[in-house]
Amino acid sequence: MSAIDREQVAHLAELARIEMTDEELARVAGELELIVSSVASVSQAAGPDVPATSHPLPLQNVFREDVVGEMLTQEEALLNAPDSQDGKFRVPAILDGE
């Protein structure tokens, strides 16, 4: 498994738009490297005779009836919104026209 270095963490931070200091980048790189090595050691623990599972217990979803409860009107929902337009929340664009 390749080591996680400061440059990879800096790239991920840039993609996530997170500002990090050099000290934070170095610390997070070390922490991520420890996590990756721990996960790698776990993946080696199960041999080829162990079937892959998503959960060790046979759990099933428990569904409930979909019952409509109290709801806000459109006006009530927009009451504390900093900005709205045409009955909808108005937020700053984040994708630069994509």
From Swiss-Prot:
One of its GO terms (biological process) is regulation of translational fidelity. It comes from Kocuria rhizophila (strain ATCC 9341 / DSM 348 / NBRC 103217 / DC2201). Keywords: ATP-binding, Ligase, Nucleotide-binding, Protein biosynthesis. Heterotrimer of A, B and C subunits. This is Aspartyl/glutamyl-tRNA(Asn/Gln) amidotransferase subunit C. The keyword ATP-binding applies. Allows the formation of correctly charged Asn-tRNA(Asn) or Gln-tRNA(Gln) through the transamidation of misacylated Asp-tRNA(Asn) or Glu-tRNA(Gln) in organisms which lack either or both of asparaginyl-tRNA or glutaminyl-tRNA synthetases. The reaction takes place in the presence of glutamine and ATP through an activated phospho-Asp-tRNA(Asn) or phospho-Glu-tRNA(Gln). The gene is gatC. Belongs to the GatC family. It catalyses: L-glutamyl-tRNA(Gln) + L-glutamine + ATP + H2O = L-glutaminyl-tRNA(Gln) + L-glutamate + ADP + phosphate + H(+); L-aspartyl-tRNA(Asn) + L-glutamine + ATP + H2O = L-asparaginyl-tRNA(Asn) + L-glutamate + ADP + phosphate + 2 H(+). GO terms for molecular function: asparaginyl-tRNA synthase (glutamine-hydrolyzing) activity; ATP binding; glutaminyl-tRNA synthase (glutamine-hydrolyzing) activity. Transmembrane segments: none annotated. It is an enzyme of class 6 (ligase). InterPro entries: Asp/Glu-ADT_sf_sub_c, GatC. Its EC number is 6.3.5.-.
